[in-house]
Amino acid sequence: MNMQRTEQIHEKANGLDKLEGAEILAILLDSQVEAAKCVLPAIEPIERGARAMADAIINGNKLIYAAAGSSGLQAMADGLEITPTFGIPISQIKILRAGGLEDMSRPKGEMEDSEEAAINDAKIIEAGDCVICLAASGNTNYPVTIMEICKKLGATTIGIANNPDTKLLENSDIPILLPTPPEVIAGSTRLGAGTAQKIALNMMSSCMGVYLGNVMDGMMVNLIANNTKLFKRSEEIVMNITDCNRHQAAQSLKKSKGSVKLKVPRFIRLKGTPNFPITAP
């Protein structure tokens, strides 16, 4: 049986420990660039994934990420930003990670193989949900088991893996192969494989946000501001889209409890429509 690509030795890794620091870093950077390029052939399934994600949210169902290890970290990085970026209710975004989301200071690698943990975590999954199952190897037991449960429940599945001919790709409704090169540090999929996964996840969730109408001209118009930085960003968005000044933007956002989308299309005079007065709800 051939060794999976994610476990193979990188062609430039021989003698790595004998090189100067700058040479080591150049090889590491080059491997990251090559990993990023591997996302391009997957544009079509990534777009289908974005539509499936948007459909789940529109229909009131959940978007769920399921992964383990380094892939679990990529899932968290993307999933935790969905609500603050696009204003999607947190009740519709769930992250299932082998070992849980608490006490992450201690690695729990043994949980990747736990079918029991997967079965227990999958209890939140319902028909109509969209579940993204990812693993660099494509065969990690935790996300594979969750995907099998999804199929029985009628949830839509998106499988992401860095190796071809793997369980996640074979069993998913929308398979996304990211064929990254072997890692410079063999098997350390937090490197190239993780980079490609992050790019693919970011692309899908961002495209989903656009499909949901939460992005206008590159601005996150469904942003819910809850800190100084985000309040300032919200003001800039309202000012950029409308003819109002900062004071008007601030007052409007105050009335909408920080909701940009609530204010811009309905209550603020849009550029090019001078006869549409600024009013309060």
Positions of PLM-derived features:
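Short, amphipathic alpha-helical interaction segments embedded in low-complexity terminal/linker regions
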Residues: M208-P281
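Cofactor-/ligand-binding subdomain signature composed of acidic, glycine-rich
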Residues: M1-C38
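A generic structural signal for well-ordered alpha-helical segments
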Residues: A56-I57, C150
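Glycine-rich phosphate-binding loops that contact phosphosugars or nucleotide phosphates
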Residues: L63-I199, S205-N214
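Gly-rich Lys/Arg/Thr-decorated short loops/hinges at beta-loop-alpha junctions or inter-strand turns
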Residues: I27-A35, K94-S105, M216, D243, ...
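Short, glycine-rich nucleotide/cofactor-binding loops
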Residues: A35-E44, C133-T140
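A short, well-structured juxtamembrane/interface segment
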Residues: P41-A56
